[in-house]
Amino acid sequence: MKYLQSTFALLTILAVSIAQGNTEKKLNVLWLIIDDQSPWHSIYGNDLVKTPHIDKLASRGVLFTRAYSESPVCSPSRSALITGSHAIRLGTHDHRSSRTKENQIFLPENFKTAPEVFRENGYETYNSGKDDYNFFYKKSDLYSIMDSKVENKLAKYGKSGQGSGDWSDIKSQKPFFGQVRVSGGKDVGDQLPDLLAKSGYPVVKASQVTVPPQYPDIYEMRYNIAMHMNSVMQTDIEIGKILSRLERDGLTDKTIIFVFADHGSDLPRSKEFCYIEGLHVPLIISAPESLEGVESGTVRDDLVSLIDVTGTALALTNQDIPESMDTRNVFDKNYKREYVFSASDRSANVIDRVRSVVGKRYHYIKNYKLDRPLFNYGHREMMAIDYPDSKYGYFAKLRSMYEDGLLNEIQATPFGDRTAEELYDLQNDPNETVNLASDKNHIAELIEMRGALAGWIEETGDKGAFKRSSKSLVEVVQRIPPHWLKSPEFRDFFDEIQSAP
């Protein structure tokens, strides 16, 4: 009997040791998610900024030059990332949706998000950044490390807010999957130049920048472009502090680091719009030397969809990518995307429907709502009208210039009538100012890109094609000032309410 007990005890100790050994061999995964930032870092060729920490990280990993977001606004993009799936497939395409009990959006039965897959494979998970997903979920299902107060306050209907948790909170020997928000282009204030100067960084001035042709060369545009460049250096400071903490805690050689933005900058034609400037994002993946496949100092120019961050994180930690996900592993030997797709639907107070496909050279955009202009008094312009001294004040200046006839044809286009199709040659026209959709010399390219987009829409069962329910409109009306709601759908909704008995 004593022999059996001793044998059992020995086997138990051995099993625990093996389990701990396997756990220790697993690498941590850290997502550093930048808000609203285009790839204007020095590693991407911008000579006006210095980003030494990001540059060093890229030198230890892989830099992707053609990564594009699923959506040009945060919550659909983040919903696609956390699910590894196209937002229009799951119905998570409208910005800040599923925030009321009456308008809950549920993922398919038995669908697992990325944090849930990590947890099932022995990881601790946390999200200290944005909790901004357009579907119903319980935070404690996704994240094992969190503040119970945050769970009670934010999880019930998947509302937007800041998460909680840190790798220092982990008491077990398990590896971690962590999400950390980096302020990027969103938290930009007048104090930023002083911060940069005190930190030994240059300060980009309005007089130094070049204004792209889609915008008028006015001080307000120069200032905002300069401040976005300064935000890039603020990002470098924040990431540098995180990397220093990893080094201090002995985690640098145990952690795969992903650095990327949810979408591009917040310039007028960037955020919320499916132009390249709103979709193109930085992407760096850095891993310990012991991990095969991630070769230090590599630069890749192939097309990458940002949702592939999810599949890559799973694959690099030897986890299977669920068949329910659209994401892929960018380091798979057979990885290749002929096209990258994106969508823009309701962004805050404005309803639209735009679909986009980026190919090796051309970018095709399909506009469905031709009864409204591109710049349709979105929330940034309404902020400028209601609060002229806000950082979005230059939106009001642009509209004033349009009304006074001071914008050229290219600059005035977003205020005028929409065209159903747009086609741009990214090689010769990176700022997308010449629409080739009606150019007979580009019929073949138009047909190719049109067909690719149609195939994606059909394959995903695009939920953005369906009419919005009254409940989804009520959800918006309850939190946004009525005078901001200028889309025809809201006008019709208000008319129905007034005419109801």
For the regions a protein language model found, what residue spans apply to each?
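Long, internal low-complexity/basic segments
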Residues: 22-27, 34, 39, 63, ...
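Active-site segment of extracytoplasmic enzymes that catalyze sulfate/phosphate-ester chemistry
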Residues: 31, 38-113, 117-123, 464
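A short beta-strand-to-alpha-helix junction
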Residues: 47-51, 69-73, 103-111, 222-237, ...
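Polar, surface-exposed loop/tail segments
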Residues: 52, 81, 130, 136-139, ...
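Catalytic-site neighborhoods of secreted/periplasmic enzymes
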Residues: 80-189, 328, 334, 343-344
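A long, amphipathic alpha-helix that forms part
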Residues: 205-255, 287-291, 315-316
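Histidine-centered active-site microenvironments of extracellular/periplasmic hydrolases
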Residues: 247-305, 318, 322-326, 342-343, ...
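C-terminal cap/loop subdomain of S1 sulfatases and analogous C-terminal strand-loop tails that border
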Residues: 310, 317-422
